[in-house]
A protein has these predicted regions:
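Short, surface-exposed amphipathic charged segments that create phosphate/polyanion-binding patches used
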Residues: 87-98, 163-168, 282-286
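Short phosphate-binding loop-to-helix
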Residues: 69-114
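Conserved core of the sugar-phosphate nucleotidyltransferase
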Residues: 127-215, 222
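Generic C-terminus detector
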Residues: 283-306
């Protein structure tokens, strides 16, 4: 079995936040959130990281992030560009929005041939998540089904005081396997608990605190990249017709299709750790405070890459 690889999705545009939050420092040493994730992954056993970025940020990204990690881990860069489409497909004129997380991952198909974990660059998952991913990926292989894993977080640990968020709300069976994910695009804190709305805030449905949600923290066997490739044209046929400027090939949607087709299982491992992220600029202070506190507790050294 090959050594698992960490894939970090860092090509997104950060539309709600403004600016390149993938590289935005969250401590006095200049580390970004993704430095902490890569550090946690390295401690868990990962030896190689692949960053999915855009050509436009390559120089800055290599200079600010890559350079300090390269002495400690094998680093590769993959580029998610709009025009990376199958033969016969074209980007609609005027479209600037990337084609989503499934497309980002598909861009890795020529450099990754091992089990892999996938994370968002701008989410903080905590050391335990990476240990669970590494342990799973080094002990599980596909049999007659694809065998995947997802690290879920309790919704109460993933919402911000500063606005609404989008979360994949998970239904899990009694054996801890994923039944379905429902993307709720507007969840916010209302009083003591989280709630979602489907009608622009006219009515709200509460979500219990311990409900597991997906934060794009997955573990896949190598064959998943082929699945993404095989399913992409059908997505484009539909998406480019219905929403040419906005359609996105979402990673969880592809997983959901495989579950419906009974071709895969996804074991859900719940992390009780708090998730941190900067969806809104106002979130940054709480992330910085949390990082500072974890350093004081000895979870992280002052400088990660010394």
């Amino acid at each position: 079995m090959k050594e698992p690889v960490l894939i970090v999705m860092a090509a997104g545009m950060g539309s709600r936040y403004g600016g390149l939050k993938q590289m935005d420092p969250v401590d006095e040493q200049g580390h970004a959130i993704l430095d902490f994730s890569v550090y946690d992954a390295k401690k868990a056993g990962f030896k190689k990281v692949v960053f999915i970025i855009k050509h436009a940020i390559e120089k800055d990204f290599r200079e600010i992030v890559g350079k300090r990690i390269e002495p400690f881990m094998e680093v590769e860069y993959v580029f998610q560009e709009l025009d990376k489409l199958p033969e016969g497909y074209q980007v609609p004129e005027g479209r600037e929005k990337p084609f989503g997380t499934g497309h980002a991952l598909l861009c890795c198909k020529d450099v990754v041939d091992a089990p892999f974990a996938v994370i968002n660059a701008d989410d903080y998952y905590g050391p335990k998540a990476f240990q669970m991913l590494y342990d799973y990926l080094t002990t599980h292989e596909d049999d007659d089904l694809y065998r995947y894993v997802m690290i879920a977080f309790h919704i109460e640990k993933t919402i911000t005081e500063n606005g609404h968020v989008s979360r994949g709300v998970c239904q899990v069976d009694k054996n801890h396997y994923l039944k379905e994910i429902t993307e709720r695009t507007r969840i916010e804190k209302r009083g003591a608990e989280a709630a979602f709305t489907l009608d622009d805030g006219a009515s709200w449905t509460p979500v219990p605190d311990k409900t597991p949600v997906s934060m794009n923290c997955w573990g896949f066997t190598p064959g998943f990249l082929k699945v993404l490739e095989d399913k992409f044209p059908a997505f484009l046929d539909k998406g480019l017709k219905e929403k040419p400027m906005k359609c996105e090939y979402f990673l969880p949607s592809v997983v959901e299709e495989l579950l419906k087709e009974k071709r895969a299982t996804v074991e859900v491992m719940e992390s009780a750790e708090k998730w941190y992220g900067v969806t809104y600029k106002e979130d940054k202070k709480s992330v910085m405070d949390a990082i500072s506190e974890m350093k004081q507790q000895g979870v992280y050294p002052e400088d990660l890459w010394k």
